[in-house]
């Protein structure tokens, strides 16, 4: 799901170039609006969107992921703010919701989660069978 038209175009070109257009579908629009309308099951879901919406994206991802599927959440440490006490007012909501995401994936007995401290952080959650 991508809302920026230029990125949609680039993604479609890349998908076609590697010959997987029959396996990948790009939805153009706002993920908050599109996700609730999807009923398919997916092997993998990659979240890289509005940081303040990560708990919502997790809820929707858990609904759509296959058993043994993997959910990736990019930028989970958000410039180091998630792991520090200091948060600029501008980032408070995003940081609070990223912390909530980490709490949810860490405490969910149906998930095995690792937080990778590479770049801006990546959460990798595998659905247990």
Predicted regions: what they are:
Residues 1-129:
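S-adenosylmethionine/decaboxylated-SAM
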